[in-house]
């Protein structure tokens, strides 16, 4: 590759004097960004790596805390490939809370999958950080127990595993110790070997220690000449007030562009396909409004309980854990107007418009439940309060159903029903779109009195057995006139034999690239909490007793009354 030079113009004398007199920087250095765009080696589109060539300066925030100035330049502006010399940068990924279940079951396997697919830079390292005392080898043994060759069952990937594990290291330290993060910084620098260093921190830890870790990492272990980004796991607070305080504290050390708030449901294949289905198919786009859609249902169910994690779950409950984030994010994607472009900010701005068009959830539009012990098939299933980590008289809901409305021209009057619960009869997540009845309905008699059987329904199954199917009415072959419902379906496992990437793979890759489309912006988070906080406070202040439902059932009866209040029948009732 030919060598290209870049000329940085000198500032004018007037601007120079201003910088000297009033600049908050400890030293004034020219800064410029460079980026590389090249085709990915896998099913993903492109990998973009952004670097910064000069040493960073320190910028004091309003509270006097230093912020990594180089990473503030992480704007995504790109130059051409010719300005980048191959191999001049390195990527350091630090998983904070590396000994936890999320890291073992999701994050490390996702990083290995990206490595296997050739989506990580040539020069990268992975560090685990936690309080647990481990050696490098012990971390590698822990990681290797969770890695599989699921990406391509025909190929043994033992060699790839070994190569990946050699890039994995461990550092033990306290989450609030600047000294321990300074030691981590030394180890990162050893692996980076003087190259331009880009650093990604994944906070797989409880939210009450987010700020301590961000403070220590920002002050002691930020990149000095590249970008620094931080992935933050939900929950993002418990209500509007705590969420706002968490954001304010994080922004003492990070800019909004450095914070990647992850909701792994946004990385799921069918959720990402939602906008493609709508905006690239003329058959659906004209129907996507109150004129043709009768109701929309967002359903989430798990066929297991808290399984010993009740102590953690009891602090939040099902509304905060699932409804306020996963289901509301899907709702916003489903209902948003056509964005100006596929740029992250354009998409996120349209989602915010949807959330701001909604009225806060009313207590009369919420049903809460809690699973109780149940004997089935000779087996005893424990109730929620039977979990030893849960208080005996806990009122925390493990099930919730809610009706919400969007007050705009497209969706006025259309009920958006949400349902989420633990210890139900099945595991799944899906979006159900029930269309209006055909005007006149010539074949009404063929369906007797149950007009719900005549309703067209679009179902997008997020998990398991990902698929899309459209329920239509057709004539049963024969001499008589008998109608039946049939499914036009796209089952992913039948149509696409290739393994579907895990949501964490896509989201980690996007964070490395600086692609923010599937991450949550602070104003989006604020708008989401504003919708749920009033009802959550009422539930807790009035000590609303949840309706009990047996472990393994379809949930409390109250959910059906809520649906019928808006002339809706839950679409999943007819399925096993």
From Swiss-Prot:
Where does it primarily localize? plastid
Q: Which residues form a coiled coil?
A: none
Q: Catalyzes what?
A: D-glucose 6-phosphate + NADP(+) = 6-phospho-D-glucono-1,5-lactone + NADPH + H(+)
How is the quaternary structure described?
Forms homodimer. Interacts with G6PD2, G6PD3 and G6PD4.
- S-S bridge residues: 149-157
**PANTHER family noted in UniProt:** GLUCOSE-6-PHOSPHATE 1-DEHYDROGENASE 1, CHLOROPLASTIC, GLUCOSE-6-PHOSPHATE 1-DEHYDROGENASE G6PD
| Residue sites binding NADP(+) 2 per the record | 419, 432, 461, 469-471, 554
Transit peptide: give start and end: 1-50
A Pfam family annotated for this chain is G6PD_N
Asked if the keyword Membrane belongs to this entry, the reply reads: no
Please give the name of this protein: Glucose-6-phosphate 1-dehydrogenase 1, chloroplastic
Per the record, the domain of life is Eukaryota
InterPro entries given for it? G6P_DH, G6P_DH_AS, G6P_DH_C, G6P_DH_NAD-bd, NAD(P)-bd_dom_sf
Positions annotated as active site in the UniProt record: 326
Q: In which tissues is it expressed?
A: Expressed in leaves, stems, buds, flowers and siliques.
Task: Quote additional remarks.
Answer: There are 6 glucose-6-phosphate 1-dehydrogenase genes in A.thaliana.
Q: Where does D-glucose 6-phosphate bind?
A: 234, 264-268, 302, 321, 422, 427, 463
Gene coding for it: G6PD1
